[in-house]
Regions:
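A short, charged helix-loop
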Residues: 1-18
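Alpha-helical interface subdomain recognition
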Residues: 16-153
Length: 153
């Protein structure tokens, strides 16, 4: 049974690839939320100088910056999913990919930094999550290429 031929088959294939990219971005954004939550919990429980380290202003500001990055990535992921078969869907997907690259890398790196040395150990799930975030970043492909496509309009 032939499902589609010619240009219709090519369009269906492009849509399937775009849907897979949206799925990978969504996986990364969801996992990044888990990493942020685990990091926030660690900052609430880890104590230094008689208080939770999350009370230190510099660390609170870093977490706020990461929350903003996550929200931007999540919003663009939703937009890409909703515009998957729209005329400007490919451009929105490229924007979502670029933002996902930026957010996943920053959230992963900061989570390890905020956890300190223990963040790199297999004892904490965060280390495994961060490895998956980096793998998703590679699976998505080059952010510079997506940015160039986006800029070309």
């Amino acid at each position: 049974m032939v499902v589609a031929q010619g240009e219709a088959a090519v369009d269906a294939w492009r849509l399937a690839l775009a849907a897979a990219r949206v799925g990978r971005i969504a996986e990364g954004v969801g996992l990044a939320r888990t990493v942020l939550d685990a990091t926030a919990e660690y900052l609430r429980t880890r104590r230094q100088f008689g208080q939770p380290i999350g009370r230190f202003q510099a660390l609170a500001h870093r977490m706020a910056d990461l929350a903003i990055l996550h929200e931007q990535a999540q919003s663009l992921a939703w937009a890409a999913a909703m515009k998957l078969d729209a005329a400007d869907g490919a451009r929105t997907l490229d924007a979502a990919q670029v933002m996902a690259h930026r957010a996943l890398r920053a959230i992963g790196q900061e989570a390890i930094q905020l956890h300190g040395g223990i963040g790199m150990t297999d004892e904490l799930a965060v280390s495994h999550y961060v490895k998956r975030l980096l793998a998703i970043e590679v699976e998505l492909g080059d952010a510079d290429t997506a940015l160039a496509r986006f800029a070309a309009g």
